[in-house]
Amino acid sequence: MKNLILIRHAKSSWDAPVHDKERFLAPRGIQDSHLVSQNIGSFLPKTNIIWSSTAKRAAETAVIFAQNLQWPLESIVFKDELYTFDSSKLEKTIKACQNSYENVILFGHNEAITEFVNKFGDIFIDNVPTAGFVSISFPQESWSQIKAGKTTKILFPRDLKYD
């Protein structure tokens, strides 16, 4: 069995005139990263590999999650190929994962994440929002063979905010 946790990077800032890959988290993104990461500990596998896009906003999201979940920062593997908005490229990267890893936690981007969870999960999600968390379990033993999985947990910042 394989377990995949997809986390969309938190809300980024558009204030500074920087290249897309260099955009940093907005204050709301920082707040939402803390909010979600402080509420998912019980849903996470004990052992895992953590991958993040090399985009600044994804990396900052991953670091906040790591700090709140007490993951060593050096356990985050930053992968250029995760800086993609294309679900077929995301799928290719996931399917290339070593089978010795049962659990993958991935910080990435939309539209790739929403399209991936709708292709491989069993619950339709119109849009995975920033800082959104989706967990999918697959019965296959090989990442390269994953097909239809079961969506086991969905948690979005709006689920944790009370007016």
Model-derived regions: residue spans:
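Short, Lys/Arg-enriched, disordered terminal segments
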Residues: 1-2, 163
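Domain-level recognition of soluble alpha/beta enzyme cores
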Residues: 123-157
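Non-DNA-binding regulatory cores of transcription-related proteins
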Residues: 97-105, 110-131
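Active-site-proximal alpha-helix that buttresses catalytic centers in soluble enzyme cores
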Residues: 2-82, 113, 123-128
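Short phosphate-binding loop-to-helix
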Residues: 82-98
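A polyampholytic, Gly/Pro-enriched intrinsically disordered region
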Residues: 95-105, 147-158
